[in-house]
A protein has these predicted regions:
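Conserved beta-strand hairpin/beta-sheet module of binuclear metal-dependent hydrolase folds
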Residues: 1-9, 90-108
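Pre-active-site segment of Zn-dependent metallo-hydrolases
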Residues: 1-22, 29-34, 111-125
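A short helix->loop->beta-strand "cap" motif at the edges of active sites that frequently abuts
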Residues: 37-40, 60-61, 174
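Cap/insert and terminal regions of metallo-dependent hydrolase folds
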Residues: 113-175
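Active-site environment of divalent metal-dependent phosphoester hydrolases
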Residues: 22-27, 48-51, 70-73, 86-90, ...
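Metallo-beta-lactamase
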Residues: 43-101
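Metal-dependent catalytic neighborhoods of phosphoester/phosphodiester hydrolases
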Residues: 28-38, 53-54
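Active-site neighborhood of phospho(di)ester-bond hydrolases with catalytic His/Asp-centered motifs
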Residues: 13-25, 42-46, 104-109, 129-135, ...
């Protein structure tokens, strides 16, 4: 998606920028390069340095890597990072908490029940806010030429239903 309208804002009051994974819809080099140098960029400490290296190459800035499943402090906010358990995805889930509020941001990750329990232990109960993706981040099935329009619509509906069922299962796991 285009992010050109972000450039119209003054972002100098940010305390930090967090990048969950290396997909370009989460890593906009033009936007990151426009930020003041004193705003740190935080990323998960993945086994691979791909994300770190990509940020350095695209922005000439060094991101700060945060270890996984350990508590970190960014300003006045505590955070902890989990990663998607799928071996093919390098994506992260960020959990933030203060003394009063908590947020679980699953970003593009699929989170397991055991991870949710661990996150709830970290924040001390149910989150005040759950951010979860309810739409697919790819163009399947619409860019696939082997499907006719009826098949594309059917596959698309199945995909949406699967996403919403997953979202509902996460919400039920929190209760």
């Amino acid at each position: 998606p285009t992010n050109h309208y972000y450039m119209e804002n003054d972002w100098s009051d940010l305390n930090a920028v967090i990048i969950s994974h290396e997909h370009m819809d989460h890593l906009d080099p033009e936007f990151l390069s426009s930020l003041p140098e004193d705003i740190p960029i935080y990323i998960p400490e993945y086994p691979s340095l791909n994300l770190y290296d990509k940020i350095k190459f695209l922005t000439n800035r060094e991101a700060k890597q945060l270890s996984l499943e350990k508590s970190h402090k960014i300003g006045d906010i505590n955070c902890q990072i989990w990663t998607e358990e799928s071996p093919i995805n390098q994506d992260s889930i960020w959990v933030f908490k203060t003394t009063e509020k908590s947020i679980i941001n699953t970003v593009d990750s699929k989170v397991t029940t055991s991870q949710l329990k661990s996150m709830m232990d970290y924040i001390g109960g149910e989150p005040n806010l759950l951010l979860i993706q309810c739409s697919g981040a790819n163009w399947f099935p619409f860019v696939y030429t082997q499907y006719d329009s009826v098949k594309k619509m059917k596959v698309s509906e199945q995909k949406k239903e699967a996403k919403l069922n997953y979202t509902w299962s996460v919400i039920e796991s929190l209760q």
